[in-house]
Amino acid sequence: MIQVLLVTICLAALPYQGSSIMLESGKVNDYEVVYPQRLAPLPEGAVQQKYEDTMQYEFKVNGETIVLHLEKNKGLFSKDYSETHYSPDGRKITTYPSVEDHCYYHGRIENYEDSTASISACNGLKGHFKIQGETYFIESLKLSDSEAHAVLKYENVGKEDETHQICGVTLNWKSYDPIKRPSRLNLTPKQQTWPQTSVNLQLIVDHSMYAKYNSNSEKITKTVQERVNIMKEIFKPLNFDITLSGIEMWDKKDLITVKTAATDTLKLFAKWRQTDLLKRIDNDNAQLQTAVDFDGETVGLAFKSTMCDKRYSAGIIQDHSAIPLLMAVTIAHELGHNLGMDHDDTSKCNCNVCIMAPRLNTNPSKTFSDCSNNDYQKFLTDKKPKCIHKKSLKTDTVSTSVSGNEPLDDNVDGFHA
């Protein structure tokens, strides 16, 4: 029987509130310091996992006590999850780490129907939760008092240290090859019954991003996993699941030329995926993450309507923010293009700042518009992508078997940023 832990987070004294501090997510202001304390230990004789399957946390937000319910995201990793790096002489070194007792959770706030949460419990609590339309961050302060955490509104995360005009300036996904939007679909009730689909996602970290994080492989791995944990929450309303098939780090050197011209880099990366990656790692889609500053305001680029394609099921992402939520939305945007989604037209869609907005808002939404829903349904109907309709092979255990990829076709609609 799964044991539930009840933890209370008590507010610290007032002197700890209101000052500025630098966290992993950036400089923050107007935060509250809280202290997680376990109230209900496991019964005598019970075996405690390092990270329980379900947990509850109680704490105060703006003076109101709330209860955060968390459930371990057991579908986060594929059965063949792998991590790859390179030796000094260029040899691939691939390991298959145990991921059974991982530390990533989704959740909700008790008594708030529309609340959501994505939390990492790897080293204290880190993540975000949404309640009554407000997004809050929680993160360990990593002070001498190891139990201290900061709770703050998303808007209080300073953007002054973010590059590429992320502070006060929205970023856009530049469209290199504009594609005419397909006609809006009038979905019947039957069409609105979304099929369960899933994708095995492979993430590649290039050498510039590896250097940006001070060659700290463990930190990079946790950072990437946090982003995918959030992405799984984003895609849930589409009945679309994401499993992480693996992370590869180009820790010694890049295996392609990562150019500032995003179009060139995307083409090179897609070709590398086809000729190298697919021969050794089973994946339906791959996304390159890089610290290279793409030309203009572009922070991502992907092929449209190419999910499952052996050559073009790919995208590239600029590591433009230290905020996990903002990066998860960026990757979700490019993955949306792979799934047939076009940019939202604010005059026709029901959302001004949804996932597929042409410009990335620094206070991002985690919602897909009705236009994106229709585009995705049309993609499923027209393209019939086989790889995402297969039974999801999710697990949290070690496995060393790797099989080939199942391509769909070579028809490509074009680039989309």
Swiss-Prot record:
Propeptide segment residues: 21-189, 393-417
Biased composition (Acidic residues): 407-417
Primary site of residence: secreted
Domain Peptidase M12B: 197-392
Keywords: Disulfide bond, Hemorrhagic toxin, Hemostasis impairing toxin, Hydrolase, Metal-binding, Metalloprotease, Protease, Secreted, Signal, Toxin, Zinc, Zymogen
Leader sequence residues: 1-20
Tissue expression profile of the protein: Expressed by the venom gland.
Subunit structure as annotated in this protein's UniProt entry: Monomer.
Name of this chain's protein: Snake venom metalloproteinase acutolysin-C
Organism in which the protein naturally occurs: Deinagkistrodon acutus (Hundred-pace snake)
